[in-house]
Amino acid sequence: EDVEALAAVEDEDEDARKAAQVKARAVWCRTMARLSMLRDQPHDFKVAVIDTVDALEAGCHAYCCIRDKQDRIGAPTKLYGYGEGYKIAVDEWRNFEALCQALKRRRGMTVVLVSHSTALKVKDATMADHEKQGMKLHKLAAEFLCDQADAVFYCHKDHLIWTDGDGERARMKIQQKPRTLCQTRLGDGWEAKNRLFLPDPLPVFSFAGYQEAAREGLKIRDRVFAHLDTLDPAERFAAELRLDACGWAVGEAAAIVGDANITAPVGATATETTNENKEIST
């Protein structure tokens, strides 16, 4: 019922769309109320999952439009200048994210936001224009939520790519494998990140496996930052640049701390592919 209400916001019929806005706004309000309840009332829950956050975006937009007496979030008006509605919506996402952070800090909960992906056009001065997979949200909302998240993963089916034939008859073929890979670091074709020293990709994604690996990764991160605190500002800046450049690879952490015993988090060992398409063992 909630999903249908959120989807109907795009209805072309004005009366139907306004009725759908009211229902979609109610979905947003219920979601915020439930997160507030988890924050304020005693309970034993350890994980909260929003599935999907791109569907919930319609509720956020409907909430803003009804509150501000606007027709559409993207329609230019005296209050909502061109594109301003989406900026106003980000303020509501900030309230949403503040509740998620409160669950993490006050209740020790993990909050998981699930989103469909979509192809995003990327203009980069260092390479040709290309597309990558990112969250199926408005650009401003996606950037905000990705910035605030501890980890952003892109999951997709593993596949083989090969060329069949020669010359003009050559054709690229793709065979999909049954297993799902979980990309944990930024790639040319997807948006992802983590600061938990996870290998990229995770060979099989499971939430239990991630939690175990994350706990080990946090221990590694604590050791790295304890070491960084002993460095002078110039050395620390250089070390942080090295970490960012390698996507927080565990091998770089071992090199910075000077401890070869630092290894990949338990349950998350995999073969990593660097930006130079070389394989390193973790």
PLM segments and residue spans:
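Conserved inter-motif catalytic segment of the P-loop NTP-binding fold
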Residues: 1-94
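Conserved GTP-binding G-domain of TRAFAC-class P-loop NTPases and closely related GTPase folds
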Residues: 120-226
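Generic recognition of cysteine residues
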Residues: 29, 60, 64-65, 100, ...
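Interfaces that engage single-stranded nucleic acids at replication/repair/recombination sites
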Residues: 1-43, 182, 190-282
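Conserved acidic residues
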Residues: 46, 109, 150
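Conserved catalytic network of the ASCE P-loop NTPase/AAA+ motor domain
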Residues: 37-43, 102-107, 146
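P-loop NTPase motor core
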Residues: 52-143
